[in-house]
Amino acid sequence: MKINGVKGMNDVLPADVARWHEMEAVAREVFALYGYREVRTPAVEHAALFARGVGEATDIVNKEMYVFEDKGEELLALRPEGTAGTVRAFIEHGAFVEGPQKWFYMGPMFRRERPQKGRYRQFHQIGCEAFGVAEPYLDAEQIALLADYFARLGVTAELKLNSVGDAQCRPAYLADLKAYLVANQGALCADCKDRIERNPLRVLDCKVESCQPVLEQAPRLLERLCEPCRAHFDQVKAGLDALGVAYRVEPRLVRGLDYYVRTAYEFTSDALGSQSAVAGGGRYDRLVETLGGPPTPGIGFALGEERLSMILEKVGRAAPERRPAVFFVSADATGALEALRLAAGLRRAGIACELDPRGGKLKAQFKQAERVGARWAVVLGGNEVATGQAKLKDLQTREETPVALSELAARVSG
C-alpha cells in the first residue's frame, strides 16, 4: 500500500528548490548589509512559550498549534512562528548583556490550519528580529530592509502601515471596540463573534464580505493613540519618507499575535490574483520581559517562502538552477572508466559535470545530456582513451571540435 504525505505537508521538489535557494541567498546578502546575523533554534519548544508569548487568546495557540506530551510528560509544541523561540534563545543565552542585537532565522513552522493554495500545515519562514532599540528609526530601517529584499527579487509589493498603540492607549480603545462589536454582532460572521470576547482587535482583520460594512464603521485606534504612540508613528513615517519607501496607512491593519505594540506593517502583492500578505511584522517592546528577560524593546517580521515562491513563479522569474557544464557520453566500458576519472578532475576544478554509469546507446545518452541542460558533451570510447583525443560537442550550437583530454578543463571552463 502506498503511503502518501501527511495532509497539509508539502514537498518542495528540485525544480522549485532552486528558487528557494535564491530567496534564501538574497535574504542572507541583504540582511548582512543591515547587520543581521543568523540564529538557528529548535522546531520543538515548550508549549508554554507560545501560550505566554504569542497569547492564549490567539487562534494560533487556541486552534492551530501542534501540541504533544513527550515521554517525560512535558507539554511540547511544534513552533507555529519564529519570534517566540528567537526571543527565548536571546534570553537563555544572555545575549542582552552585549547590547542591541540583530538576528535572522529561516526554517519550518507548523500550524494545523485548513490547507489552501500557498498555505500549508508545515510552512517555511524567513524572519528578522532586532533587540534593544526603542527608537522609531529602527522600525523604518527594518521596513526598508524588507523593501530592498523584495526589490532585489523583482517583486512588486505594497507596504501597509499602522500603529496598534500600547498598554497606555489600547485598553480604553479595546473596550470601545468591544462594545461596538457586541452591538453589531448580528451582522458579523461566526469567527468574528467568537473573537469579540477572546481577541476583539483581530475582528478588524476579517476578510468576509458580509462583515465589511460593520468593520468600516468601527472605532479606529489611530484616532485614539496616546501622544507617545502618535509621536512614534509620525517618526516611523518620517523615516520611511527619508528612505524613499512608499507606504499606505491602513487603520484596520492588525497583527494576529498579542505581543505587538505600536508599529504594525504588512507587504502585500496582487500577483496571485488578490491583495495577499507576503510578509508582516511589528514592534514587541514587552515580549522579552514577558518571557523572563530584562525589559528590552524589539521589532521583527516574517515572510512566507511558499507564497513568495509562488509570486516569483507567477511573475515569470526563472529559478536559477546550476546546470552541468559537461556530460560524458560513454561508447564502451573503457570510455566509461575514463569518464569517471575525468569527471572527478573537472569537479575538483569546480566544473560541474555528469555521466551515465549505465552507458547504453549514444543517442539516448545525448538526449540525457540535453535533458540535464549540459553545455558540452564529450564522447569517450577505447579509441579516444588510447589517443588522448575526443570530440567536444557544443549542445547549443551543435558544433563539434577535437579536444585533447588533457586540455578539457581549460576548454570548458570559459
Curated annotation (Swiss-Prot):
A GO term, aspect molecular function: histidine-tRNA ligase activity
Q: What's one Pfam family here?
A: tRNA-synt_His
Q: Which InterPro entries match?
A: aa-tRNA-synth_II, aa-tRNA-synth_II/BPL/LPL, Anticodon-bd, Anticodon-bd_dom_sf, His-tRNA-ligase, HisRS-like_core, HisRS/HisZ, HisRS_anticodon
Listed A to Z, the keywords are:
Aminoacyl-tRNA synthetase, ATP-binding, Cytoplasm, Ligase, Nucleotide-binding, Protein biosynthesis
Its GO CC terms? cytoplasm
Q: What is its EC number?
A: 6.1.1.21
Please classify the protein's predominant subcellular localization into one broad category: cytoplasm
Q: Give its localization.
A: Cytoplasm
Gene Ontology annotations of biological process type: histidyl-tRNA aminoacylation
Question: Which positions carry the signal peptide feature in this UniProt record?
Answer: none
What is catalysed by this protein? tRNA(His) + L-histidine + ATP = L-histidyl-tRNA(His) + AMP + diphosphate + H(+)
Q: Which HAMAP family match?
A: His_tRNA_synth (MF_00127)
Instruction: Relate the assembly described in the record.
Output: Homodimer.
NCBIfam families in the cross-refs: hisS (TIGR00442)
Protein name listed in UniProt:
Histidine--tRNA ligase
Organism equals Anaeromyxobacter dehalogenans (strain 2CP-1 / ATCC BAA-258)
Gene this protein is translated from: hisS
